[in-house]
């Protein structure tokens, strides 16, 4: 969130889409601290969207929520019109899930954890499909696993993205 808000100072983002919004904390924070005209968020889970909507209302933040598996149910008029896409998708490699702390693996929905064999399945889909939804010069922002930076950088380069930066978050 901090990186997006920092970048918004120079890029003047007006529209942003959060993919896999969960409880809605990312778009709510962006709505509270940023200067966005349009904030959209999607999740595959109706239950998560219910919590996200409730949280947005409690915080008086306008967000358009959609039940969607990535981009599948988004309004067509968004194509080519988004300034930025943000996502904290499932990024844990399938083989590592059993090693997670009990309070994580036993209470988080599996589809919120499992990022496929190498943890990059959702990134691949967003990177590939995101280009048609972003404006020219649009931005992708991701939360990633501590050891996925170089693999994601290569993936982004393969799809022609530039100005790629990997930063450590507050947790390191």
Residue ranges, per PLM feature:
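Conserved SAM/SAH cofactor-binding pocket of Class I
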Residues: 1-99
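Short glycine- and Lys/Arg-enriched binding-loop motifs that mark or flank ligand-binding interfaces
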Residues: 2, 16-20, 112-115, 134, ...
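Conserved functional loop/turn residues at catalytic and ligand-binding sites
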Residues: 20, 43, 81, 108, ...
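Class I S-adenosylmethionine-dependent transferase superfamily signal
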Residues: 30, 104, 126-130
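Alpha-helix initiation/capping motif
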Residues: 41, 75, 112-119, 145
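Structural signal for short hydrophobic segments within the conserved structured cores
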Residues: 64-66, 111, 165
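Mobile active-site "lid"/loop adjacent to the S-adenosyl-L-methionine
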Residues: 91-121
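Conserved Class I SAM-dependent methyltransferase catalytic core
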Residues: 117-172
